[in-house]
Amino acid sequence: MSDEDLRGTVEQVGRGFNLGEYEVEAYLTVLRHGELTASDIADRTDIPQPRVYDTVRSLGDRGLVELRESRPMKIVALSPEDAFAGLQEDFQEMVGALEAEYTQPARNTEAVSLVKSRSTIVRYFGDVIAEADFELVCSLTPSLLERFADDLAAAVDRGVSVDVVVSPARNAPNPDAFDYAAATTAARGRRGITTPVIAVADGRYSVYATQDAVRDDSDRYGVIFDQSALGFLVSGFFDTVLWSTATESLYDPATELSLPRTYAAIRRCVRDLQSVDESVYATVTGRDVLTGADRRIQGRIVETRFEESGEVATIIVYTENGDRVEVGGRVAALEDVEAHEIAVARDAPPAL
C-alpha cells in the first residue's frame, strides 16, 4: 500500500467512526428495538425532536440504519456485522499496512527508567514475564494476575519457577476457580492494599510500581530496572518483605523439589534446599567478595544456613579441589563468593 493510500485508509476509518453524541444514542436505541419512528426515538432518548431527522439521516448515510420513507418515516436497524463490514475490511487493511511500516524499538537498556502511563507500566509487566528464563517473582493485584494468567502459564511451561504474591488477599481468585497450578509454582495472598506490584525476571529485569499506578492514577510512576545489580534489590525486597509476610496460601504443591533448577536469588535457593535430604550439587557463577574477580565454582553442597528473616542465606560448596567455599547472595560480605546465578542438581554439578 502506498503512503497516499495508507493515509486515505486511515482517514476513511477515522471518518467511519466519527459519530456524534446524538448519533450514538439514536443508533443504539434503534439497534435495541429493531424498528422505530422519529417520534419513538425522541420519546426514548434525550435528542430534541427537531434534531431527530438530521440524526437518523446521518446514520442512514453511513449505512448503519435503513430509512423507509413512509408516513411516518421508519428507521430500521441493520445487522452490525453487515453495517460495519466495510469498516472492518478498511481497519484490517490499515492495521496490516501499519504493521509493515512498524519498526519495533529496542528494549530500553538504561539502568533505571521511570514510566508514568498505566498502559506502559502494564506492558512492562508483560515484557518482564516474557523475558524470564529460569526464575520469575511477581507481586500482582487480582486483576493483573488474571490479565497475565496465560503469560505466567507459558513461563511455567518453559520451566521457569514462578512465585506469585496476590494482594489484597481478600480479592484473590479462589483456588477452586483459578488454576494456580498452571500459572504459578507457588502462590500466596498478602493482606491489605499497600503491597506494591512487582515482577522480576532472573533477578535482573524488573518493574516496580504502586497499586495506584496500575489503577490509572496519572500522578504515580513505575520504575523499570534493567541491570542485575539493581533488579536484585527488587527481588530481595520481594523475598524478605513481601513473600515472608504473605500468610495466605493460595497454591503450595508440597511436592519433591524438581531439579535441576537455576536460581538468581540465594534466599530462594537455600529455602528450597531445606526440604532436600539427599546430596545435591551446585554450579555457581559470581564474583570474589574480596577481589571482585569473576568466580565460577562447582561441587557438592555440604551445608546451608538460612533464617526466615532473610538476614542469613548461605550455601557451602565442597569443590573437586577440596576447598570449602562459602557462597552468599548479592552484596555478600561474610562469604567468599557473591552469587549471581546458582544451578542445582542431584547427581553432579549442572551446566550453567
Swiss-Prot record:
Disrupted gene: phenotype observed: Deletion causes severe growth defect in various conditions, such as nutrient starvation in defined media, metal depletion and excess, and oxidative stress.
Keyword Iron-sulfur among record annotations: no
GO terms of molecular function: DNA binding
Free-text domain note: Contains an N-terminal DNA-binding domain and a C-terminal sugar-binding domain.
Protein name: HTH-type sugar sensing transcriptional regulator TrmB
Organism encoding this protein: Halobacterium salinarum (strain ATCC 700922 / JCM 11081 / NRC-1) (Halobacterium halobium)
Classification via InterPro entries: ArsR-like_HTH (IPR011991), TrmB-like (IPR051797), Tscrpt_reg_TrmB_C (IPR021586), Tscrpt_reg_TrmB_N (IPR002831), WH-like_DNA-bd_sf (IPR036388), WH_DNA-bd_sf (IPR036390)
Regulation acting on activity, per entry: Does not bind DNA in the presence of high glucose or glycerol.
CDD domains assigned to the protein according to its UniProt record, in alphabetical order: HTH_ARSR, PLDc_like_TrmB_middle
UniProt key word Iron-sulfur: no
A UniProt-annotated Pfam family: TrmB
Family statement: Belongs to the transcriptional regulator TrmB family.
Annotated function: Coordinates the expression of genes functioning in central metabolism and its associated pathways. Acts both as a transcriptional activator and a repressor in response to carbon source availability. Binds to an inverted palindromic sequence in the promoters or ORFs of target genes.
PANTHER family associated with the record: HTH-TYPE TRANSCRIPTIONAL REGULATOR TRMBL2
